[in-house]
Every structure is written in structure tokens, then in C-alpha cells.
Amino acid sequence: MPEAVQTQDQPMEEEVETFAFQAEIAQLMSLIINTFYSNKEIFLRELISNSSDALDKIRYESLTDPSKLDSGKDLKINLIPNKHDRTLTIVDTGIGMTKADLVNNLGTIAKSGTKAFMEALQAGADISMIGQFGVGSYSAYLVAEKVTVITKHNDDEQYAWESSAGGSFTVRLDNGEPLGRGTKVILHLKEDQTEYLEERRIKEIVKKHSQFIGYPIRLFVEKERDKEVSDDEAEEKEEEKEEKEEKTEDKPEIEDVGSDEEEEKKDGDKKKKKKIKEKYIDEEELNKTKPIWTRNPDDITNEEYGEFYKSLTNDWEDHLAVKHFSVEGQLEFRALLFVPRRAPFDLFENRKKKNNIKLYVRRVFIMDNCEELIPEYLNFMRGVVDSEDLPLNISREMLQQSKILKVIRKNLVKKCLELFTELAEDKENYKKFYEQFSKNIKLGIHEDSQNRKKLSELLRYYTSASGDEMVSLKDYCTRMKENQKHVYYITGETKDQVANSAFVERLRKHGLEVIYMIEPIDEYCVQQLKEFEGKTLVSVTKEGLELPEDEEEKKKQEEKKAKFENLCKIMKDILEKKVEKVVVSNRLVTSPCCIVTSTYGWTANMERIMKAQALRDNSTMGYMAAKKHLEINPDHSIIETLRQKAEADKNDKSVKDLVILLYETALLSSGFSLEDPQTHANRIYRMIKLGLGIDEDDTAAEEASPAVTEEMPPLEGDDDTSRMEEVD
């Protein structure tokens, strides 16, 4: 037996090859070893997860070729702490690694996540995120000073990898105890990390992190028990003791702890009895809980769901809501879906994997980034789907064509929407959900025509009547006026901006509620959401706004149109191509004018959003953004005085300047940007000068900026000062 150990540790014949760690890996290991982390326990979670992945792989291969399991049918993970040697060993009967795998996976080829993880660590990220970056195996160095990996793959010999993390590692052929197939990771623990050899501590970590691993995790602990034997037996045991020293892991070992007093206690005609301590190996399965999604939902507590959610997602917070269901009939599958408490910071990044639902087929893990399983707008959902009908050896290409998967997807979307609707009944929790995932709901309305109606019921908005509460479209409809035919909304940047907008003046005066849409995605959402419960959605910033009015109001409006028809024509001539038309408004109360867009063009807000796109299409910008209509308020003193001025002398130069000033100011107040802000600013400065009584021909001003004075649009001189004051 000692010879075998010697061969394993220092093989005489086999050559030992030494390799250097790839620079990034060496850097990562140095970071792990030299930094203090409070939660070092995650090393065990990572190593058990790696074992589970290796077992998944061999099980997956055996489905098409059962002979792959001839080297060991029992799929399991064993944990063996050894206090005497200060080692913790993790053994699995997974797929194992070839020599090439060992060299590549454990040292010479950096995973894509290595650099990203180091950057995250240096930025203050938690070490427990290591598994998400594909470098979990290096977490062993949180607790170990040396790591030995012995592995056997069906297609190769048994090899041993070893490193003390000094920048290099060795690989050699291993002649030790044959594994059959699988991997044995031996951690030679640091002096101050012996807590991880304690039975209680190992159980605690496995329960916390690896309870739902699909393979049995067995813990082997050496224990002692009292046993009564006769004197003769005790002597025999003493003689055998030395021979058995090497076999303590496999057979009980006995040591004499009998005392003289015990020897004196005899039963007349019976032989002397002796009490001895017997060592034995206690084996205990740590994860008897079967996969939670296969159990009856009525038997599962919220705490169990919470534990499973955390083990599935590595989230530190509890989930917000859960949906556990099974579908039976022509198609059978079980699913467990979770809504997280908060959205990840990179939720809408293109490079991010598109979903987080793990796909299992008959309890065998297949993949965790199957894009066909759930639409992109639901990519924040977490969970598992376990199908009974998909073939186990299904490829990505086959999945894309699979009708079964399309049915599963349809059911998952349906159940997600059911879950959100249930969540909406709890105002407090729905508020948390909506703050995090409202963009996803709106994206769904834009993309998913089939479920648009259900998704629209989940929308919540501030309105002119809701105060600080967000309300649903259904709530809005129940509060509509008797003669109101439309749902009115306005889009903009902030709640205050839209609430003070000129567009909502008359509606608010008439007590008509207006929905405030203040997220950029709302613009895309309402392009697709044309109506709600038979009521058309109407933007108050677009032309042709129909407000409920009686015959008398209609008659008055017609009279005003006739009265201001001439002014509208003059203003259109002055503004030329800047606007499509100038009309009398029915939406203004306190503002003199506003700019509205055509029914099918972009709103001012949409134009702003599109201008901000780095890859925008300028040709689209041209025809979508050009249709502007100027609406004037016939009841406003500025417009009335301007009408009188224009009718008195339509060639009056100040009229032209005032019209342009009104137009540019209306552009700004309506949410558009100015093409030439400097010219507008100069006009305003001249108005200020007139207001302050400063002589326009002031020579000092001319000397200061002669060029600007020349370029400035003409405002009439002193003769017109009184006229300007009239307009004010």
C-alpha cells in the first residue's frame, strides 16, 4: 500500500510535464490567493457545480451510446474530508478529462470571462460571482495551498494535474488507485481553513448552495463508536492494528480503551469483556430533496421556493413572485418561473444571453440559453422548464424548428402574463415589479401582437387626475366622461413638463383626463397600441384633435375660424415651408400658439428620441419629421392684436418678425429643437433691449459686434417701440 502512495505522489517512470499558467489566469489566481474574502465557502459550491456539469455530460452522451457508462453506472458526487492529512476530496463519476482537456481547461487557455471577472472583482464585486464567469474551479485556491486533480476520461489514460499556484502546474500519467471514470479533486487546505473538514460545516454549505443538484452528494466521515468484545478478540485486534492502519477508509479500526476497573467486572463463568472504540466510515446523502419542480406545488413552502431561486440564480434577494405549473395532454412539461426583485443592470444589452430559463428534458439538463424558449421582452424571467417530449439529444438547430418548443413557448408566455395579472392585485408588490420591468411590458406591446391586449391591461401611467398614483387604462376608461369617445395621452420627457404643456390646457379645463407617457419606449408602444377596450388612443399633440363639444361650441369655433382665416394665410406665407399649415386651435386656453404634428408623423418627443439615435436613418428623419402645423389661440390677446396689426398693414415688417418669434417660441414650448438657436436668441435680446428702452443704433453695441448686427433679423426701430408695447 505505501508503494502505491509513493507511485502516485512521485512516479519513478512517468515523466512530469510542467506548464506555465496563461498570464490572465496567473493574475486571477494571485488575486484570489492574496485578497481577503469573507465568504470563502463558495469554493465548494463551484466544485460541486463542476462535478454536476461533468455528470450531466456523461449522462447526456450515454443516452445515444449506453456503453459510455460501462466504466461506472453510478452517477454521484462524494465528499471526503481527512483531518489527519488536512485534505478535502471531491470525487465525481462524471465524464472526466483527457490530458488535453486538463492542460487547456485548467491553465493554458483563459476563459472569455477571466478578464471580465478580474475587472469586476477590482471594482468591488462579490467573489461568489466567480461561477458566472466560467472560472469557478480556481476558487479552490481560496482555501487550498495546493490542488491535485486526478481524472480519467473514457478516451484517455488516468492523469494527475497539480499546482500550488506559483505560476505553473504539472501534469503526469497517474498510476494510483484507478477511478474507472470521473474526476477527483484533492484540496490540501491552508492551516487556517480546517473548518471545511468539519462535518457540520460541510453539511451547512451543501444545504445552502447545492441542495438541488440532480445527483446524490454523499459525505464520508470517519467516526468512532463503543463496542464490547471478549479479551481474546481484543488481543487479536491489537495484533492486526498495524496492518490495518492503511485501510481506515475502508474497514473499521479498533483501539483498546479498556481500563483495569472494567477487567475486574466479570460474570462468573463468562469470559472477560472489554469495551473498545471502533472507527468506522459514516456515509450520508446530503441532498435527498428531489428537484423541486417535480414536486406538488401544494407541498412546497415559500422558503423552499426562495432557496431554490437563490441556488438557481445566485441572487442575494428573494424572488418577487413565482409560478409553478405542469401541462399535460398531448404535450407534457413542468415549469417553475420566478420574477426577480430587480432588473439586472444590463437587461437590454445585445451581447447578453437572451434568456435565463434552464431547459431540462426528463430531468436531464440540456441548456440554459435557449433563445426560442421565451420571447426577448420576458428575458428577465428566471426558472426551469422540464419537458417529457423533446428528444434528449436535441441540437440548437432542431430546437429552432421544433413544434413542441413553440407550444412550450406559447404556454410559458401565457403563464407569465397570468403571473403578472395575479401580481397586479397586490398594489405594493406590483409597484415594485412595474418600476423594474415596465419597459419589458411596453416592449412586449410593440413586439407581441398576439398578447397585446393582455399586456395593455398591465400598463400603469400617471394622468392629469391621478396625482402621485399610477393608474391602469381600465381605471382611466371607468372615469371617462359620458360623451368622451377617445383615450387622450401626451408624450414627453418628464411628468412636470407634460402637465404644464399647452396641449393639455383645454382638456384639463373641461375635466378630461390625459395620460402622461414619459418614457421613450412609450412612443414605440403607442404606435402599436391603437385602442383599448374599443376606445381609440389619441395624442393631444397631433392634428385633428376631437374634443366633446355641443352645437353652440361648434358654432362659436366656426365663427373664430372665419374671423382668423386671413391671419392664418398671412402667417403661412411668412413661415413658408417651415409649417404645412396654420389653423385656429381648439386645444389652447392660456398659450398663444403651439406646434402640432400630422396624424401619422412623429411627435416632438419621438423626433427628439430619433435624433439621439447614433445609427439613425436620415431619409426617414426627412419625411417623418417634416409635417408641422401651427395652431393659434383665437382668444389670446397676442393673436388678436397681431390680427388687427396684420389687417391694418399686411406688409408691416414687425408682423413678420413677431410671427417668426411666435413660431420659434412655440417650437420650443411644444418640445421641438430649433435649427438655428442663435438667431432666435438674437431676436429675444432685441426684444429685451426694446423693453429696456435701449437705442438700437447705440454705437457702442455696433462696435462691440458689427457682424452680428448685420446678420440680425430686422426688428423695426423706434417708430415700432409703441407697437411692440401694444402687443405685450
Curated annotation (Swiss-Prot):
Composition bias type Acidic residues, residue spans: 229-243, 252-264
Chief place of localization: cytoplasm
A GO term, aspect molecular function: ATP hydrolysis activity
Annotated segments matching region Disordered: 226-274, 698-728
Activity: how regulated: In the resting state, through the dimerization of its C-terminal domain, HSP90 forms a homodimer which is defined as the open conformation. Upon ATP-binding, the N-terminal domain undergoes significant conformational changes and comes in contact to form an active closed conformation. After HSP90 finishes its chaperoning tasks of assisting the proper folding, stabilization and activation of client proteins under the active state, ATP molecule is hydrolyzed to ADP which then dissociates from HSP90 and directs the protein back to the resting state.
GO CC list: axon; cell surface; cytoplasm; cytosol; melanosome; myelin sheath; neuronal cell body; nucleus
Residue span of motif TPR repeat-binding: 719-728
Origin superkingdom: Eukaryota
Subcellular location(s) per record: Cytoplasm; Melanosome
Record text on subunit structure and interactions: Homodimer.
Entry comment, domain topic: The TPR repeat-binding motif mediates interaction with TPR repeat-containing proteins.
Purpose of the protein: Molecular chaperone that promotes the maturation, structural maintenance and proper regulation of specific target proteins involved for instance in cell cycle control and signal transduction. Undergoes a functional cycle that is linked to its ATPase activity which is essential for its chaperone activity. This cycle probably induces conformational changes in the client proteins, thereby causing their activation. Interacts dynamically with various co-chaperones that modulate its substrate recognition, ATPase cycle and chaperone function.
Listed name of the protein: Heat shock protein HSP 90-alpha
Gene: HSP90AA1
